[in-house]
Amino acid sequence: MYPSKALQIMKSVLNGGNAPFLLGGTGVGKSAVVKQLAEELANDREIVSDVINPTAKQFGWIDFRLSLYESVDLGGLPYIGDDNQQKRAFLGNLPIGGEGVLFFDEYAQAHPSVQAIVGQIIYERRLGEYILPEGWKVICAGNRSSDRAGSNALPSHVVGRCSIINFE
């Protein structure tokens, strides 16, 4: 599939309220196509990386290379609150306002516990008490298990929650 076609499909998927998932071999340009989509969605606003609350003149870009994360990095550290209820302390790496793209790359190489956490963000746009702001789009990418890139098969709940786009 050509990058222009992938861009068109991803826009359609996002407009339908779903998360696109680019699935393809190593080095075929999946990440570059997602970055290009972010540039188009920014609509002449400044793209800012790793800013969790971009201003109206900015468009956020947060790129999680999931193979580098552990579940506590995304799921937060558990603690007991003043009300004796278990809570989670997040590390401040998830968006709290504004608009942008939350890109989960190397999804298939991530540990299954990380995949499960991201699955909740994809489907429910939340993680425990954390709620992903409306202005943020979730996009995923990864290699196929047949690519021998250390990839795991995608969990069925994630396949059901995303629109898989095969990218060559």
Which sequence ranges carry the predicted segments?
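AAA+ P-loop NTPase catalytic core and its hallmark functional loops
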Residues: 1-168
